[in-house]
Curated annotation (Swiss-Prot):
PANTHER family: LARGE RIBOSOMAL SUBUNIT PROTEIN BL17M, RIBOSOMAL PROTEIN L17. Transmembrane segments: none annotated. It comes from the Bacteria. The gene is rplQ. Signal peptide: none annotated. Belongs to the bacterial ribosomal protein bL17 family. This is Large ribosomal subunit protein bL17. InterPro entries: Ribosomal_bL17, Ribosomal_bL17_CS, Ribosomal_bL17_sf. One of its GO terms (cellular component) is cytosolic large ribosomal subunit. Keywords: Ribonucleoprotein, Ribosomal protein. One of its GO terms (molecular function) is structural constituent of ribosome. Part of the 50S ribosomal subunit. Contacts protein L32. SUPFAM superfamilies: Prokaryotic ribosomal protein L17 (SSF64263). It comes from Bacillus subtilis (strain 168). One of its GO terms (biological process) is translation.
Amino acid sequence: MSYRKLGRTSAQRKAMLRDLTTDLIINERIETTETRAKELRSVVEKMITLGKRGDLHARRQAAAYIRNEVANEENNQDALQKLFSDIATRYEERQGGYTRIMKLGPRRGDGAPMAIIELV
């Protein structure tokens, strides 16, 4: 299995990817470094595929990974509900390729290459 270490321990890396995945599901578009976006892409694609499956086991697998954060305050919807009700139905006929990565310029402080990752 191939992955990027991202300069962190495995627990820190997993926590960061969980946070970024939850943020991408809630906001549908985030700005991060290019390598984080490329690593995040595979995780988000798996979560959306779980959402498309839609059974109880898939919901529990996604709930074990996605943080319990409020996605929409007016109808009290959390990130997991948004994944299974809104995002999964949007990509029902699409077979993968749910995300798009657009490269930006370098970050001002350290020159790290930045990118925007968004749901298609």
